[in-house]
Amino acid sequence: MAEEDDSPIPEERFTPEPDASSSPEGAPGNGGLDEDVALAINGQYIKDLSFEAPHTPEIYNDLQTEMPEIKVDIDVGAEAKAESLFEVMIKCRAEARIDDKLVYLTEIEYAGLFTINVEPEALGPVLLIECPLILFPFMRRIISDLTGDGGFAPLMLSPIDFAALYQQRMMQA
């Protein structure tokens, strides 16, 4: 049996209070955040979501003996909403098939609203690389939960190289 610890709980805070010297000039009372932060996420949300498994429950018999072929397509996009305010979207389509029979199809458009204050030449990489990197883990969890809740093994998407996607897009432009 463990001994009880009778040591008093310290009265000081575990996280120090910010003092005036830790706050950027011109930013009193904002918790130390600069008003011209290069990137801030204002919110994130599902814009569109669908899941289809048209051959359940019969497909479960096929899954006992065969592994489905899974094809995943990812695309990113961005749209200006106001000055320094951008909506960034990741679209993902995942399709599982055994031969020509659809096991499941899921599509999601996951988005975030970002305030971005960077030089114009840096805007493209921030919108199409940095912002999707922030959104991707949340979208990945939704897809995993959705396929698992659909009665299948959860689909765990591999990390996406958004920098390579961006470079590919620039070469095609």
Predicted regions located by residue number:
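N-terminal intrinsically disordered, cationic/polar leader segments
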Residues: 2-134, 141-173
